[in-house]
Design a protein with these regions (language model features):
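Short His-Asn-centered micro-motif
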Residues: 73-75, 83, 155-156
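A short, exposed loop/beta-hairpin motif centered on an aromatic-Gly-Thr core
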Residues: 67-73
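Alpha-helix initiation and capping sites
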Residues: 74-79, 133
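Short active-site loop/helix that positions an aromatic residue
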Residues: 77-91
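Active-site and NAD+-binding cores of ADP-ribose-processing enzymes
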Residues: 1-62, 87-206
């Protein structure tokens, strides 16, 4: 059975031509995020606290303030909904005052492509996209340590199989001053989009 091992020492990781994915500055990125509660981060900033339970948090444990940042984005609304509400498979439009936000990065993002051959060449497997979160975070820490100037990771959602982005510290300067769109999930227009996404993946809408 294919397993995801712990990563080697960061200096053992290698890059070859074609291992990086480029996300152009005209690409629309989506994020579904809380605006109330603990450890809330505004839409255009990285989270410098962690690691949380999220798959690719690059911060060293134990959880706490860090000089390494992270933020997650998808290329479609359905993947945002699937990922954020996966525990209960129900979309709560009130708890945490969630917002749906879209923006275009201010420059091209250069990301390590975890959907190609890089994982297997470096001792991992495609499970780095879908495996146990603690092991994926160990790989994220090793990658971030090896290439601190890398903007982050290009990977696929374990829920939908669609592309996702984990942005690391170097990508912190790529948020524009204003979003293309940012509305609460309770907004009638946003609720319609989210309801359609929830129906598509079989989630309830609260």
């Amino acid at each position: 059975m294919v397993k995801l091992p712990l990563p080697p020492a960061p200096e053992a990781l290698t890059l070859e031509e074609g291992d990086l994915a480029a996300v152009a500055e005209h690409t629309v990125l989506w994020r579904l995020h809380r605006t109330a509660g603990e450890n809330v981060v505004v839409w255009n900033a990285l989270r410098y606290w962690g690691p949380s339970h999220a798959r690719f948090d690059p911060q060293q444990p134990p959880p706490g303030p860090s000089d390494r940042g992270v933020s997650y984005a998808a290329l479609d609304i359905t993947t945002c909904v699937a990922e954020v509400f996966q525990d209960r498979r129900a979309v709560d439009t009130a708890r945490g005052a969630p917002y749906l936000t879209a923006w275009r990065p201010s420059r091209t993002l250069h990301l390590l492509d975890l959907t190609g051959t890089w994982p297997i060449r470096n001792g991992a497997s495609h499970l780095i996209n879908t495996g146990p979160h603690d092991l994926c975070r160990a790989w994220a820490r090793a990658i971030d340590s090896r290439w601190p100037d890398l903007d982050g990771l290009w990977h696929v959602s374990a829920m939908t199989g669609e592309p996702e982005i984990a942005m690391f510290t170097a990508a912190g300067d790529t948020f524009p001053p204003r979003p293309l769109f940012s509305r609460p999930l309770s907004d009638p227009g946003t609720r319609g989009w989210v309801a359609a996404a929830a129906e598509r993946i079989g989630y309830d809408l609260i």
